């Protein structure tokens, strides 16, 4: 009897576990880009404030820019961040989010604004319930490497 109670409790505990891994609704496409910050974009520095680079197409045959393109930016944490230009609510490659010149990326289709200031790309208006699809941004030796997470 004690054995069955333990098995039942274990089964209940396993069913109560929830997978909390973030899965984006934006389709997974290859992402690979290496940017020579010092040589190509010397003013794109991660020092206090938001700076943005966008790429809707690869610059070289060896690069890949995700589903709708890359939004590469710096945030208040003085780190480099990257995400896909596709709005996770609309999923339109032909209408990527656009940087507003301040702290937000705006979707021209649904009107959602995504906050870039803390490096998360989170929705602010409640239209979308999902952040922009994040990518890994690693900086070292003057080079910024963007890849899948």
Locate the predicted segments by residue.
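C-terminal motif of bacterial Sec signal peptides marking the signal peptidase cleavage site
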Residues: 13-16
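Sec-dependent signal peptide recognition
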Residues: 2-10
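Flexible, solvent-exposed short loops/turns enriched in glycine
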Residues: 100, 105-108
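N-terminal pre-ligand scaffold of iron-sulfur
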Residues: 20-100, 118, 133-149
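Short metal-binding segments enriched for Cys and/or His
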Residues: 114-125
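Short Cys/His-rich metal-coordination motifs, predominantly Zn2+-binding knuckles/fingers
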Residues: 89-90, 109-112
């Amino acid at each position: 009897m004690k054995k069955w109670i333990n098995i039942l409790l274990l089964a209940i505990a396993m069913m109560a576990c929830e997978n909390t891994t973030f899965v984006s609704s934006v389709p997974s496409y290859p992402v690979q880009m290496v940017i020579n910050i010092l040589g190509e974009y010397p003013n794109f520095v991660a020092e206090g404030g938001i700076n943005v680079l966008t790429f809707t197409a690869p610059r070289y045959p060896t690069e890949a820019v995700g589903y709708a393109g890359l939004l590469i930016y710096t945030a208040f944490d003085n780190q480099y961040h990257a995400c896909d230009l596709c709005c996770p609510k609309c999923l339109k490659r032909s209408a990527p989010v656009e940087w507003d010149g301040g702290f937000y990326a705006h979707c021209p289709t649904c009107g959602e604004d995504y906050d870039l200031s803390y490096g998360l790309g989170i929705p602010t208006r409640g239209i979308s319930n999902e952040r922009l699809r994040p990518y890994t941004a690693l900086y070292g030796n003057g080079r910024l490497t963007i890849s899948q997470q």
